[in-house]
Each structure stands twice: as structure tokens, then as C-alpha cells.
Amino acid sequence: MSMKHLLFLVLFVCSSCTEPNVKDMLGDDFRLYKHTPAWSLAKAVEDEDTTEISKQVLQMHISVDYRDPKYKQTLLMLATRTNKIESVEKLLALGANPNAHDDSTKYFGESAVLSACRFTGPSSKILALLLKYGGDPNSTACGVKENGLGEIVPMREFALSAAVFSSFEKVKLLVDAGANINYETSTANCAIENCMIHGRMDIMLYLLQKGADYRRKFTEIDIDKPDYPTFEVDILYKLRKCVYPIGSKAYKEKMKVVNFLKRKGLDYWKSPIPSGMYGVIMREIAPKNKADFDYYIKHY
């Protein structure tokens, strides 16, 4: 091998071994802790070595809520995001705070509870453990995020609204733990509105049965006008915008919601079809002819 090729190989190996800078690491990277006193604890959490976790906290006196230098998240939060069930349980048993949140000046300001609900990776068992050890079922982000225009805006997503997207089981755990079913924030929809956005009619029916306010108003934006004014609508209007193939699972679940509301005095079948929905139906359902279109309009 020539000296030139040998030098190239050495440089390649060295560059391959170079770890990314902390500022380039994502929030689920245990190496965030590498150059901190909690590195051994972090490795034990990653490996789910509960004996070593206990040793690091009880004998080496490493704070169970030690925060990483970038996101200021605790190891409980990191263990939650990476679905380390045994580590989560051990950290909680050692006193880790399930309601501690990460940096709220640069990042979302979310707790382990909210992370467990926002991501699909963490299992329902992890959320159950967090709630068992005092996690707030109404956990709400208190940080910031970047919107579509590149502006920094408040982040106020909360556990129940987030769980609608990730897991029915997590929704049930939160409700059983006392979550406010009608909770909403300045930047996050109430849970039943998220159900309609994400097509989770099954979860919507469950929340309605548990006491969700079906007479509340929802805010819509009139995109056909230049100043995009807002206006209020009822739940029937919102349901009219939920378009599913007739006979599909989502359609059948929607009809259960429709029947529930009918028993409460709200007749979906007498509600007008919002303007613009005919075009949506043509695009999403693609009826073959006018007869199919008319049938769908009558039954959707």
C-alpha cells in the first residue's frame, strides 16, 4: 500500500471515529451526557442496568434528575423517549421527577409525561409508570417552537391532545388518571377536535362518553376571504368535514358518534354540508358517476 493510500485510510478511520458535537446531537442521544458527571448513569440507563443506576444515584451521589447540557432534559425524559421501561421504573423509584421539563427558552419545555404522549415509541406501560409516580395527566408544554414562517412562537401542546395521535390506550390512561377532557390551550386544540383532525372517531366516541363537551364551539378560518377571518361552528359542522369511504372502519366509528349525538338532541343528518366539501368528496372518494356522488352525499 502506498503512503498516500495509507494516509487516506488513517484520515478516514479517524474521521469515522469522531463523535458529533453536542450541539449537533438530537434529543434521544445518550452521548449528550458523555462529558458530564452523569455519563456512567446515562450509560446504565441506556443499557437498562438497574443495579448500576441505583449505584450511581445512591453511592456515587449523581442527581437522579441530572440534566444534559443542550436540551436540559433529565435522564427520565431520555429514557421515556427511547422506551427504556426498566430504566424509567428504576429512576422513578429513586425519586426522579416525572413533571420536570426541558429547556423552555429554546425548546418545547415538555415533561416526560408529554413526551410519552407525543411520541409513538414510548409504550403505554411507561406512561402508566409516570402517572403512577405523580405525573400530571394535564401536562402542558411551556416552551417555544418555530412555526411555518420561521417565527418563534409559544408551544402549549398538552398530554391528552397529543395522545389522540399516538395511542388510544394512552388516552384511556390519562382519562383514568384525571385528565381534563375539555382542556385546550392557546396553541393546542381540545382532544375531541384533534380526534376529528386525525380521523380517530373511536377515541372521539370514548371521550364523548366520558363527558367531553359536545355543545362547545370550534373556530374555523375562512380561507376564501383575503383577511382570513375566523368564525365559530358546532360539532356537527366539524363532523361534516370528516370524509371516509362508506362502510370503512372510520365511517362506522363516525356513525357511532353521529348516533351518540342524535341521542343528545344534535341531529347530524339535518346539518348543512359546509361549502367546499363537494370538492373534497370528489377528490377523496372519487365517485364514479353522479348516482354514486348523490348516494355518498346522502349517507356520509
What does each of the following model-derived ranges do?
Residues R31-K43, Y66-M77, H101-R118, T140-A162, ...:
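Ankyrin-repeat boundary/"N-cap" motif
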